Amino acid sequence: MTQAMVKQTLYDYDLNLWLETVISQLRSGDLQNVDIENLIEELEGLAGRDKREVASRLKTLIEHILKRCYVDMPNEFRGWEVTIRTQRFELEQILEQSPSLKRHFVESFDKCFKFVLEDVRSDYSQYPFPDTW
C-alpha cells in the first residue's frame, strides 16, 4: 500500500515566514520564485476583509444611530454616542486609506440598514423605527 505524499509548502506551515519570503522576492525582482497562486489568494482575502470591515462598521454605526434617535433610554445615550463617534472615525480612516471602498459603502448601505433594522426592531419592539433611512 502506498501513501500519497502531500507536498507541504512554506505557505502551508508558516504564513509569516512565507509573507517575509514573498516580500523579499518581490523587492529583489525575483519574480520567477514568487508563489503567485497563494499570493493571489492572500490579496483576494485582503480585499474581501476590507469590504467586510466596512460593512461591519457601517452596521454598527447604523444600529447605534437608530437606537440613539428612537430608543428612549437616556442612561444608554452616552455609550451609543461614543460608539457612533468611534465608528464614524474608523470608517473615515478606512475610506481615506482606500477611497475605492466608498463605492462598496454606498452599495452596501441599504442592505446593512435592512439587516440592522430587523435586529433593533426585535430587540426594542416597543419603539417605532423608520422603514427607510
Which residue ranges define each predicted feature?
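Surface/interface-facing alpha-helical segments and adjacent flexible terminal/loop regions used
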Residues: 1-60, 66-133
